[in-house]
Amino acid sequence: MGNKNIKPSKENRLSILSKDKMDSFKRGSFREKSRATIQRFSSLRREHIKVDHPDKFLELKRGIYEIIQKSSSIDVDKRTKLMSNIKTMMINPFMIEGLMTSLENLDPDNKMSYSSVMILGEFDIINISDNEAAFEFINSLLKSLLLEYSISNDLLYAHINALEYIIKNTFNVPERQLILRGQYLTPIFSDLLKYAGLTIKSNILMWNKQFIKPVSDLYTSIRLLHCVTESYKVIGMG
């Protein structure tokens, strides 16, 4: 009879370990998990999943996604021109001040406003005026010009992460004192929050539900601007 206590050789042990790892990988592989995650996200975007108490953050992201999808009629050349015009305007404080003033009094029925002409420049303005979704996209983008320093310093993505942190920790409560540390307490980001009307004492954000609207607007603007700047960089114009 064979000796049951004989240990497997080094080669056999390595083979067994390798097989176990492969089996584990197959049972919960990254590809399978990624596919499941993508499917869940896609179903959320199509709003096939209904919940009794929808998360405000998901609702906000859905709205942004819809604007971006509808604005896909703006072709690459026009997006490139848009970014070129924005970067040109950033070095002219007078133009920025005039643009922001005009946006405060923007008439939704007047597509040929001062701000539209300033930014659109050589665009075919008439066609864009006929496209409500594109105009909504452009208008939201214009309002984000206060973030002009973020374009040149590549800070948009950091702002997105910081705002998402705040949104996830505040939108579902009426009041809260949220401690901000590290990447969530940079001078530039603090200025953005103050622009939205929030109060920061030392490193504590004094939250009230009345700030949901301005923070949502700020987050939407940054996401849209990030979307366009990424497209701008991909085609080699950044």
Swiss-Prot record:
InterPro entries: Orthopox_A47. It comes from the Viruses. This is Protein A47. It comes from Vaccinia virus (strain Ankara). Belongs to the orthopoxvirus A47 protein family. Pfam families: Orthopox_A47.
